[in-house]
Swiss-Prot record:
Gene transcribed to yield this protein: polA
Residues annotated as domain 5'-3' exonuclease: 175-260
Record-stated family: Belongs to the DNA polymerase type-A family.
Enzyme class: transferase
Record keywords, A-Z: DNA damage, DNA repair, DNA replication, DNA-binding, DNA-directed DNA polymerase, Exonuclease, Hydrolase, Nuclease, Nucleotidyltransferase, Transferase
Role according to the record: In addition to polymerase activity, this DNA polymerase exhibits 5'-3' exonuclease activity. Unlikely to have 3'-5' exonuclease activity due to absence of a 3'-5' exonuclease domain.
Superkingdom classification of source: Bacteria
Protein name, per record: DNA polymerase I, thermostable
GO BP term, pick one: DNA-templated DNA replication
Biotech use: Used in the PCR method because of its high thermostability. Has a relatively high error rate probably related to the lack of exonuclease proofreading functionality.
Pfam families the UniProt entry points to: 5_3_exonuc, 5_3_exonuc_N, DNA_pol_A, Taq-exonuc
E.C. numbers: 2.7.7.7
Length: 832
């Protein structure tokens, strides 16, 4: 039992940071975080967050220690040291350099000693500081440093908890002076410490509990159980080597003054954080003025002010306006009566401007959306999809207070506009497409679309009967009833009872997969699979659309109001939610019957306009392939022509199977379909599928050249872009892992095609909307390549002609754009 420790009053506290270990840990923990330029920065961000957390409580003196580039004495003593670790990731060295720059800008001491690892430097610093009367904390998750623990030296884990000698005893039943002995006995795969084969953690702890130390244990080998003794004797060299490698050095002659840390270089630190788009860290490092400190001013605000508002829920057609404020030039104006104050605004300028515009339209007010920082951020990088994320990235915090949101909008707009200076194509997209489109979408959301509720109720009953019939058929084929919605029960029936081959396993649990992809592959293996797929489709559509749609009808308008998301996809396409109209199947019978429920107002008709093969036409324009261009210019069927070239037969000899193969390849090329996937789609041998793809590129040689050029530019610039300059960053084009790199390549050459098609649709909507208003018609829905309008019966034909003309002439391409038009009382009949 130790005697009572004398009272200790430390001179101060020293914080030692295991820089290399912390950087590597955060690099893997936050994978995927990049700047809007596609620059990976996850290690820098994670390191800064962990360091900030530690700096708030610790460290009169702070020293950050990194591994030196040269090999350490351990590598020289044992060539296999740390050989079990994966090679350094390609993005890591550059981020490590940025981390060191951050440390310097923060005014923190930085140290690396050639020939020694950070562990030895940290250990020597800790012991030196302890000897000089300091309390020491080491920020690390490296267990090697547990051997340093004492009453004055503690380890601060990056997750925030403190590791002390008492913690070590409670967790492992070991003292700090036993830790290197324990590691020597058990070994460590990551450091390639061999240890003693056959001695695990439990046995090692028991031996140290009995003998106190490795030294005492080795002096009493003859008193050990024979099995343990034999293992140790057989691996004595490994044991001694492991101890030498596990024991950290505490005697490095380091000349360090544990003085108080220097002040950070605030201006350069701010510029550094802004360059890496660490907006939230500007606040945390105290480099931003708080919006709460802004001057209060009376309502109404001056013209051009940015608005901030708070809704009771995210859907503006259903929400209450809880608070409204505006900010301009450092002053915040809070509206005493939010609804009444809407009349004082000429435009909704600020984050989520479209939502406020929709709410105003609901209230009978014309409040067009103006500048929205969200749209600027989205054009800079399409991964910017939420106000929370944009605020965090570019300097601020998205709070629940309207005044703070208004001030944030003003600050973000200035920041983002500055970043877009000189980016003329992106600015053109903002001014001519995205900003005016937000006003169009606001009107579409506020207008909504009628639903045939009686029809949906009847359809629900009909589908319920069909589901019950399919369920009974599945039970008959299985030989007994079971819960069809239980994946575990379905797994047993398919693979254990019916003996179907298990194709794949789930990622999380490793169980045999019953996913849609697996069932599709097993479709021909047993009749039950087809029935299960049909059951799943019907239950999904019933629960997602048929049953919920009537409940989404607004009581005030009697119409369904879907939300159009302008900043949600990586390609620039619009998406919708509440409900998601994109997921209604186009080609299945039930999907088509659901579309039948979307109907025109009494005395009106729906006009459906669909761009025909727009992505293939865009591909023809972007690639400049003469054969592809000629087909569209001459108005011939692209799939028949492709089949004719691929199979070497006249057009007249192309049969349905040939055309289907050509169609699959035509669209498959856009998404980087592999020969393996094509062989599955067409049920043909792999070699034949490979030959098909090769013949396709021989038929359209400039398509392959364009793909290669796009990938080359993507690697060089870090991004790919549409015809109009919309960007998508693809840093993984340089990834070492083949599957990751190939996925990035597919993404890279698909985005310019899909994104250009999206840009054309958006531009057409912007041009068409005012013309429709002049004719008393409405724009209702935009789904995939389709636009749905509503027009008075007597003007429906004229509206259809106008819309077709605008959409086909939206922008001159090397090939004509073609729009298929239909008119009907419901969405389905308008498509037929």
């Amino acid at each position: 039992m130790r005697g009572m420790l004398p009272l200790f009053e430390p001179k101060g506290r020293v914080l030692l940071v295991d820089g290399h270990h912390l950087a590597y840990r955060t690099f893997h923990a936050l994978k995927g975080l990049t700047t809007s330029r596609g620059e990976p920065v996850q290690a820098v961000y994670g390191f800064a967050k962990s360091l900030l957390k530690a700096l708030k409580e610790d460290g009169d003196a702070v020293i950050v220690v990194f591994d030196a580039k040269a090999p350490s004495f351990r590598h020289e003593a044992y060539g296999g040291y740390k050989a079990g670790r994966a090679p350094t990731p390609e993005d890591f060295p550059r981020q490590l350099a940025l981390i060191k720059e951050l440390v310097d800008l923060l005014g923190l001491a930085r140290l690396e000693v050639p020939g020694y690892e950070a562990d030895d430097v940290l250990a020597s610093l800790a012991k030196k500081a302890e000897k000089e009367g300091y309390e020491v904390r080491i920020l690390t998750a490296d267990k090697d440093l547990y051997q340093l623990l004492s009453d004055r030296i503690h380890v601060l884990h990056p997750e925030g908890y403190l590791i002390t000698p008492a913690w070590l005893w409670e967790k492992y039943g070991l003292r700090p002076d036993q830790w290197a002995d324990y590691r020597a006995l058990t070994g460590d795969e990551s450091d390639n410490l061999p240890g003693v084969k056959g001695i695990g953690e439990k046995t090692a702890r028991k031996l140290l509990e009995e003998w106190g130390s490795l030294e005492a244990l080795l002096k009493n080998l003859d008193r050990l159980k024979p099995a343990i003794r034999e293992k140790i004797l057989a691996h004595m060299d490994d044991l001694k080597l492991s101890w030498d490698l596990a024991k950290v050095r505490t005697d490095l002659p380091l000349e360090v003054d544990f003085a108080k840390r220097r002040e950070p270089d605030r201006e350069r630190l701010r510029a550094f954080l802004e360059r890496l788009e660490f907006g939230s860290l500007l606040h945390e490092f105290g480099l931003l003025e708080s919006p709460k400190a802004l001057e209060e001013a009376p309502w109404p605000p001056p013209e051009g002010a940015f608005v901030g508002f708070v809704l009771s829920r995210k859907e503006p057609m259903w929400a209450d306006l809880l608070a409204l404020a505006a900010a301009r030039g450092g002053r915040v104006h809070r509206a005493p009566e939010p609804y009444k104050a809407l009349r004082d605004l000429k435009e909704a300028r600020g984050l989520l401007a479209k939502d406020l515009s929709v709410l105003a339209l609901r209230e009978g007010l014309g409040l067009p959306p103006g500048d929205d920082p969200m749209l600027l951020a989205y054009l800079l990088d399409p991964s910017n999809t939420t106000p929370e994320g944009v605020a965090r990235r570019y300097g601020g915090e998205w709070t629940e207070e309207a005044g703070e949101r208004a001030a944030l909008s003003e600050r973000l707009f200035a920041n983002l506009w500055g970043r877009l200076e000189g980016e003329e194509r992106l600015l053109w997209l903002y001014r001519e497409v995205e900003r005016p489109l937000s006003a169009v979408l606001a009107h579409m959301e506020a207008t909504g679309v009628r639903l045939d509720v009686a029809y949906l109720r009847a359809l629900s009953l009909e589908v319920a009967e069909e589901i019950a019939r399919l369920e009974a058929e599945v039970f008959r084929l299985a030989g007994h009833p079971f819960n069809l919605n239980s994946r575990d029960q379905l797994e047993r029936v398919l693979f254990d009872e019916l003996g179907l081959p298990a194709i794949g396993k789930t990622e999380k649990t490793g169980k045999r997969s019953t996913s849609a992809a697996v069932l599709e592959a097993l479709r021909e293996a047993h009749p039950i699979v087809e029935k299960i797929l049909q059951y799943r489709e019907l239950t999904k559509l019933k629960s997602t659309y048929i049953d919920p749609l009537p409940d989404l009808i607004h009581p005030r308008t009697g119409r369904l109001h879907t939300r159009f998301n302008q900043t949600a996809t990586a390609t620039g396409r619009l998406s919708s939610s509440d409900p998601n109209l994109q997921n209604i199947p186009v080609r299945t019978p039930l999907g088509q019957r659901i579309r039948r429920a979307f109907i025109a107002e009494e005395g009106w008709l729906l006009v459906a306009l669909d761009y025909s093969q727009i992505e293939l036409r865009v591909l023809a324009h972007l690639s400049g392939d003469e054969n592809l261009i000629r087909v569209f210019q001459e108005g011939r069927d692209i799939h028949t022509e492709t089949a004719s070239w691929m199979f070497g037969v006249p057009r007249e000899a192309v049969d349905p199977l040939m055309r289907r193969a050509a169609k699959t390849i035509n669209f498959g090329v856009l998404y980087g379909m592999s020969a393996h996937r094509l062989s599955q789609e067409l049920a043909i041998p792999y070699e034949e599928a490979q030959a098909f793809i090769e013949r396709y590129f021989q038929s359209f040689p400039k398509v392959r050249a364009w793909i290669e050029k796009t990938l080359e530019e993507g690697r060089r610039r870090g991004y790919v872009e549409t015809l109009f300059g919309r960007r998508r960053y693809v840093p993984d084009l340089e990834a070492r892992v083949k599957s990751v790199r190939e996925a990035a390549e597919r993404m890279a050459f698909n985005m310019p095609v899909q994104g250009t098609a999206a840009d054309l649709m958006k531009l057409a909507m912007v041009k068409l909307f005012p013309r429709l208003e002049e004719m008393g018609a409405r724009m209702l829905l935009q789904v995939h390549d389709e636009l749905v309008l509503e027009a008075p019966k007597e003007r429906a034909e004229a509206v259809a002609r106008l819309a077709k003309e605008v959409m086909e002439g939206v922008y001159p391409l090397a090939v004509p754009l073609e729009v298929e038009v239909g008119i009907g009382e419901d969405w389905l009949s308008a498509k037929e």
